[in-house]
Amino acid sequence: MTQNTFFPIFPHQHLLGIKDLNVQDLIVLLDRANANIPFSKKIDKKQSPLHGCTQINLFFEASTRTQSSFELAGKRLGADVMSMPIGNSSVKKGETLIDTATTLNAMKPDILVIRHSCAGAAALLAQKVDCCIINAGDGAHEHPTQALLDALTIKRAKGRIEGLTVVICGDILHSRVARSNILSLNALGARVRAVAPSTLLPAGIADMGVEVYNTMKEGLKGADVIMMLRLQRERMTDSFIPSIREYFHYFGLHKENLSYAKSDCIILHPGPINRGIEIASDIADGPQSMIHTQVEMGIAVRMAVMEALLDSRLKASGEKK
């Protein structure tokens, strides 16, 4: 890794969740990500701070945006990137997560990016391996890089985060994105609201500093930012809503519901989008939508995270760069 003096204070060697970061940590990562945007669009051999580093992506859950984003982020930084094909791996033959991690650790990677259906999987690996761990989503627990890219998208669109009213709508119960965003947005000074049917709200959400509403009309009043969440039917074992049609009418984002928010509000969605379920196509593709911008910001954010973690590890180990 080449000399990098951009991170004077970033004490973390893993990114397991937003809960582990303070406001200064968030600002450092967002500032670096913002600086990375010009370099996130193509490989620049003159800007290769991760040259000679190895990044392994270990996705136990299907992913398009997040896995591709991490692959591109590593390559933009000059890292050697390997994505493990879980479908053909020893995991399918009964190998445990710990055994897989131990095997990969023997290969001496510098970064291990993991997505897993079990909450705490990334934290468990961090105790077992010698490299930097990045949580790319663990069950319904956290998705820290998604929260960071959402914050960067908001800040670039609105010029600030502090003082904004951000409304998170939809399947909050099953959403790791919601949890990470609540933590980051509260820390950065936003006013956070949640709108969902009571069956899709986690217990104790109000204790996280969130204003809770059960109607879009009330919840979207004065909204600067609307963040729609996918209805995660694959995680549902019971009937949480009467019907898709009724859910879209009352809790989907269509013209009538959007009219309750500020006229200049922006719309976010972590993807994948279920058109006609949580958001109408004309809204998802409309001028207020920042969905494609979020994807673009994701590469810059993940570049910043990898740089920061490796820089911190090298400083802690006393290695000469």
UniProtKB/Swiss-Prot annotation:
One of its GO terms (cellular component) is cytosol. One of its GO terms (molecular function) is aspartate carbamoyltransferase activity. Carbamoyl phosphate binds at R65, T66, R115, H143, Q146, G271, P272. Keywords: Pyrimidine biosynthesis, Transferase. GO terms for biological process: 'de novo' pyrimidine nucleobase biosynthetic process; 'de novo' UMP biosynthetic process; amino acid metabolic process. Pfam families: OTCace, OTCace_N. PROSITE patterns: CARBAMOYLTRANSFERASE. InterPro entries: Asp/Orn_carbamoyltranf_P-bd, Asp/Orn_carbamoylTrfase, Asp/Orn_carbamoylTrfase_sf, Asp_carbamoyltransf, Asp_carbamoyltransf_Asp/Orn-bd. It catalyses: carbamoyl phosphate + L-aspartate = N-carbamoyl-L-aspartate + phosphate + H(+). L-aspartate binds at K93, R176, R230. Pathway: Pyrimidine metabolism; UMP biosynthesis via de novo pathway; (S)-dihydroorotate from bicarbonate: step 2/3. Its EC number is 2.1.3.2. PANTHER family: ASPARTATE CARBAMOYLTRANSFERASE (PTHR45753:SF6), ORNITHINE CARBAMOYLTRANSFERASE, MITOCHONDRIAL (PTHR45753). Heterododecamer (2C3:3R2) of six catalytic PyrB chains organized as two trimers (C3), and six regulatory PyrI chains organized as three dimers (R2). Belongs to the aspartate/ornithine carbamoyltransferase superfamily. ATCase family. HAMAP family: Asp_carb_tr. Catalyzes the condensation of carbamoyl phosphate and aspartate to form carbamoyl aspartate and inorganic phosphate, the committed step in the de novo pyrimidine nucleotide biosynthesis pathway. This is Aspartate carbamoyltransferase catalytic subunit. It comes from Bartonella quintana (strain Toulouse) (Rochalimaea quintana). The gene is pyrB.
